[in-house]
Every structure is written in C-alpha cells, then in structure tokens.
C-alpha cells in the first residue's frame, strides 16, 4: 500500500499550486476516481480533461492490471490543468498521472504525461536528470530503438521520453527485486503513448504531421490512425479487414489477443508483445503491439505480409495488394 505514496506526492505537488490568499483560487473537483484541478485563471494551454486522458491508457486497457483507487484518497488518476496558469508569466504545464495495480503480484504501474507551452526540451532533458539524481539514468531505450526525440531509462523499471511539447514517463513500482522487471513491457507501454501523442488533435508536436494514406483496392482506409513510429508504419488491425482479413478477439482481465485470418494463413498478436505467432512460427516484431481505443495497433507491413498481402509504399501513400 505504501507504494501509493508516489501518487500521493504528485497530489501534494498539485496542491502546492493553490494560489495564496487574495488571488483567484484553484478549481478542484473529483469524478470517477479522478482528482482534477485547473489553475488557468490567467493563462491556459487550451487542453481539456478529455485531451489529457487521450494521452494515456484507459483504465481497462492494460491486461493483467486494474485501475484501483488509491486507498488513502480514493483517486486512481490525477489531472492538473494549466499549472502556473494563475500567473501572467513563466512556465505553463498540464499533466496527467494514472496508476494501475498488477492483479497477480500487487506491483504498481504508473504513467505520467506532461504537456508544456513550449517544446519540452526547454524544461526537461536528459542532462537535468543526470545531474539532479543520485541514480544515474542510462541514455536510450531498453531495446535500443529511438522512443521520441530523446529517451532514457532507470534499470528495468522506468522509461522517460519527450516528443514535441510532451514528456512521458512509464514507471513500475515493484514489491520484489527490480531485476525481475520486464523493461520491454515498460517500453511497449511508452510506444503506445508516443502513438497517442502523434495522433492528438491539438498538434502537440508543434507542427502538422504529414498524414499517411492507406489504400486497399485503391480506396483509402484507416484515415488518421496509420502513422510512422521511428520509421516503422503502424496501424490498427482493423485496417486490414478490407483486404479480406477476418479478426477474432479474445479479451479478458489478464489477456488481450487478436487472431487475424486470411486464405488459410493466420497471425496471432497480444497486447504489449514484441512478437507474433503465425502459421509458419513466431516472428519478432519491429515495434510492439499496443491497444488504442478498443483495438490493437501493430507493425503494418510485417502483419500484412504474414497474411499474404503485399505492401507497397511511395512517400506517404501505402497500398495493400492482396495476392
């Protein structure tokens, strides 16, 4: 239970933003296990509660984990809108922190996302953490792949990255030896956060992203959900359905698995896995599988080709050509 103190500290910091006597007071309210505050009496980032929730996983999107309220305050999510927005100048930030509990071990998982008014590198960088902590972070991700514009990790339990105006951290708070943690699971969660950042309607990267057009039989599909993550195109599995792919979903509290079938060939993927099972054996994936709005997002080319679908790309246009 005491591991929840990390979230309690976050709540305390949020509380410190309450203006002193004589200034407009911070607005604060609770709803559905969320503690929400808004300091934007003078300035605002223009982000809503829904905008912040869109940057993290839903309460039931991580198999094997449950979004339980903190036993000390009844909250599982803390959202702070427009931090420092009660002052006319200085930094401006909105944040969301959400915690989950592992159903089997009781270990805690926390995802923190912070959105700034300027490129996040002006406020947070690897160097800040390198000199400001007794534990030296290691530059890069667990897999060696480039998550965001800059990333680093601590042991196997924490991954930090920044992208555009956003900083995100995924942290495991273990009740056992940290060496037993799965760093690639932590990283898979982070890739799902980067996907959400890139898809966010408020353009948190500071510029408009070039859309990827997916064509099946010369007709566009999956508009707005097909993007590149560090050079690898990913998309929800449903984008393959127009190519005569049949999807079968098995989702429980502890597992989220989808089987895709086409002409006797099949692919089976699980949420947060780095490999897929096929009718020809297991295949390592270039990017992990992760959930988004009720679907699983996968590396498009690898899955399509395993189902006998040819993939051709020219610029920002990708064509699926069923064989």
Q: What spans do the regions from the language model cover?
A:
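Short, Gly/Ser/Thr-enriched beta-strand-loop segments that form substrate-interacting elements
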Residues: 140-156
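A short acidic-to-branched-hydrophobic micro-motif
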Residues: 90-128
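Short, well-ordered beta-strand elements
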Residues: 165-178
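Short, solvent-exposed coil/turn segments at beta-strand boundaries
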Residues: 146, 161-167, 230-232, 293-295
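Bacterial N-terminal signal peptides that target proteins for export
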Residues: 1-7
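N-terminal "mature-domain start" segment
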Residues: 22-105, 134-145, 175-204
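Primary recognition of N-terminal secretory signal peptides and signal-anchoring hydrophobic helices
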Residues: 199-323
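Hydrophobic h-region of N-terminal signal peptides that target proteins for export
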Residues: 11-21
